[in-house]
């Protein structure tokens, strides 16, 4: 009996929600824009989107520079050891170099991780 009452209450609630009118928004003035104003507004949105995209690319390139400088510093440290030749010939370092040549911004972190992993292999 309790399940029946609960099911009926849920059906009634969904029926009320479906039949209700949508609430009016506070941005009613947007509905009254002319076509010219609409185009200007869309142009501004497009410019803002382009600006945000350029910021994202800048952040990626800045991150790339950080990771590459860390990788170079780490590489200089481990290069002093004679065992480095074995690490540099290993497959993961070759793959990291290939990734870097293919897409330096996206895969700089992978290069950094590869060099860091090489240092861990050498020095434990």
From Swiss-Prot:
Residues 20-62 form a propeptide. The mature peptide may form alpha-helices which disrupt target cell membranes. Its main location: secreted. GO terms for molecular function: toxin activity. GO terms for cellular component: extracellular region. Residues 1-19 form the signal peptide. The keyword Signal applies. Pfam families: Latarcin. The keyword Signal applies. It is found in: Secreted. This is Cytoinsectotoxin-4. Expressed by the venom gland. Keywords: Amidation, Antibiotic, Antimicrobial, Secreted, Signal, Toxin. The modification Phenylalanine amide is found at residue 123. Insecticidal and antimicrobial peptide. Has insecticidal activity against larvae of flesh fly S.carnaria. Has antibacterial activity against Gram-positive bacterium B.subtilis B-501 (MIC=2.5 uM) and Gram-negative bacterium E.coli DH5alpha (MIC=10 uM). Belongs to the cationic peptide 06 (cytoinsectotoxin) family. GO terms for biological process: defense response to bacterium. InterPro entries: Latarcin_precursor. It comes from Lachesana tarabaevi.
């Amino acid at each position: 009996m309790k399940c029946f009452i609960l099911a009926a209450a849920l059906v009634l609630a969904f029926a009320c929600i479906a039949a209700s009118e949508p609430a009016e928004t506070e941005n009613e003035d947007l509905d009254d824009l002319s076509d010219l104003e609409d185009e200007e507004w869309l142009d501004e949105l497009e410019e803002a989107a382009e600006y945000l995209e350029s910021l994202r690319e800048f952040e990626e390139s800045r991150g790339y520079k950080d990771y590459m400088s860390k990788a170079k510093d780490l590489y200089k440290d481990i290069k002093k050891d004679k065992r480095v030749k074995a690490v540099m010939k290993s497959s993961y370092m070759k793959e990291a170099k290939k990734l870097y040549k293919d897409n330096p911004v996206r895969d700089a972190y992978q290069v950094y991780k590869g060099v860091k992993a090489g240092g861990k292999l050498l020095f434990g």
